[in-house]
Curated annotation (Swiss-Prot):
Domain of life assignment: Eukaryota
Species for this entry: Anopheles gambiae (African malaria mosquito)
Name the UniProt record assigns to this protein: Antimicrobial peptide defensin 3
Protein purpose: Antibacterial peptide mostly active against Gram-positive bacteria with atypical up-regulation of expression.
Gene from which this protein is expressed: Def3
Induction: Not induced in 4th instar larvae following a blood meal, an infected blood meal, sterile injection or bacterial injection (E.coli K12 RM148 and M.luteus).
Keyword annotations from UniProtKB, A to Z: Antibiotic, Antimicrobial, Defensin, Disulfide bond, Secreted, Signal
PROSITE patterns: INVERT_DEFENSINS
Amino acid sequence: MKFAVVSFLLVALLGLVAVGEAQLKNLACVTNEGPKWANTYCAAVCHMSGRGAGSCNAKDECVCSMT
């Protein structure tokens, strides 16, 4: 029974982290600070999530690329 509860909590926590990361990734390129700051923030989000380098595209989306 404890295993089931711990497993459920772990899956729920991982789900929250994934949703939070997706929201950060979507908001990374929308800023009033300018494109240089947005690209730096996007690159940091991609790097911290283990997805390599990142940059903002023309649609203001943060795109991570494994290199």
